[in-house]
Amino acid sequence: MIYNFGAGPSVLPKEVLKKVQEELLDFEKSGMSVMEISHRSKSFQEVIDEAQNNLRDLMSIPQNYKILFLQGGASTQFSMIPMNLALGKKAYYAISGAFGKKAYDEAVKLSQTLDFEAISLGSTQSEYYNHLLKIDTSKVDEKMAAYLHITTNNTIEGTTIFPENLPEVNSVPLIADMSSNILAVDYDVSKFGLIYAGAQKNLGIAGLTIVIIREDLLNQKESLSSMMDYRILAQNGSMYNTPPTFAIYLAGLVFKWVKEQGGVKKLEAINHQKARMLYDLIDQSDFYQSPVLNKVERSICNVVFTSPSKELDALFVQKAEEKGFKSIKGHRSVGGMRASIYNAFPIEGVLELVKFMKKFEEENK
């Protein structure tokens, strides 16, 4: 049995893969694959409309928010966000992980040629991002602030800002990179001005990014490139140009699957259960260690851990691969191991990993 612990691209629901397989050569008796039908066709319009409606239902997205299905990875949003929202203002960033730093660095780069200021509220990089930044919102100039940017789940480092710990920002739009825990943790969308997420973790496959943006934040100036302008993309229903049709179709199937599982709250409870099995073992062991300083900040999507040495880490990864546990090696920047147990990851796989970890500890103490 193969278990895919990859951080993204990652495991997909078996039911979704079977549906794709079933429809691959003949989508809804059209005689064509979904990869072949026109994005301007009635059939595909129904696909994107249904996907949008199901995502709105799953996340209880208010009607004054637009849902965009965009090309490229979430990293493209590191540029699009300040270009659309920050001109003439101050853009604030709270940095608790590598991807948060990338977002800030991109804003700094853009601020050298565009009229806005990129400001860091602090970073935990010097502590290897082993805890979340304590965000001091008193440093935010509310009159001049375009937004405060956070990352809700740090995929590499294994930390999460859970809903109860979101910063209080008053009138300042809160922007979240939710790439690795969207639909895995239940957030109140109305607390955010903009949410974005690459699809290849909890939503589907690479090549698609979903943006959820409050209508009042849509750019009103004509100065932006059309492909980088949220307003134009929203006005055209995510089809200003040819969208990533297959990725949207597949995301739509994932949304249906999430609904069939009972919705986001139900899956979040299961995700807590899966993560707890691993964290309980780690906490009770003298052999394994979690690098995350505060237990309440531990991710339920990306469980990061180490053994007593780099040599044992390498042996663990090797033996795990032989056992059928794929892509469990930690990110190259931090080492160790990382078990990414997103929505589609089966609880049986976690139970098997726990057994393996216990046996590995016994054999290598």
UniProtKB/Swiss-Prot annotation:
EC number: 2.6.1.52
Keyword vocabulary terms for this entry: Amino-acid biosynthesis, Aminotransferase, Cytoplasm, Pyridoxal phosphate, Serine biosynthesis, Transferase
Catalytic activity: O-phospho-L-serine + 2-oxoglutarate = 3-phosphooxypyruvate + L-glutamate; 4-(phosphooxy)-L-threonine + 2-oxoglutarate = (R)-3-hydroxy-2-oxo-4-phosphooxybutanoate + L-glutamate
GO cellular component: cytoplasm
NCBIfam families: PRK05355.1 (NF003764), serC_1 (TIGR01364)
Sequence similarity: Belongs to the class-V pyridoxal-phosphate-dependent aminotransferase family. SerC subfamily.
SUPFAM superfamilies referenced in this protein's UniProt entry, alphabetically: PLP-dependent transferases
Modified residues annotated as N6-(pyridoxal phosphate)lysine in this record: K201
Free-text comment on the cofactor: Binds 1 pyridoxal phosphate per subunit.
Cellular localization per UniProt: Cytoplasm
Associated pathway: Amino-acid biosynthesis; L-serine biosynthesis; L-serine from 3-phospho-D-glycerate: step 2/3
Cofactor: pyridoxal 5'-phosphate
Binding locations of pyridoxal 5'-phosphate: A74, S75, F99, T155, D177, Q200, N241, T242
UniProt name for this protein: Phosphoserine aminotransferase
Function: Catalyzes the reversible conversion of 3-phosphohydroxypyruvate to phosphoserine and of 3-hydroxy-2-oxo-4-phosphonooxybutanoate to phosphohydroxythreonine.
Alphabetical list of Pfam families matching this protein: Aminotran_5 (PF00266)
UniProt enzyme class: transferase
Molecular functions per Gene Ontology: O-phospho-L-serine:2-oxoglutarate aminotransferase activity; pyridoxal phosphate binding
Subunit structure: Homodimer.
One GO BP annotation of this record: L-serine biosynthetic process
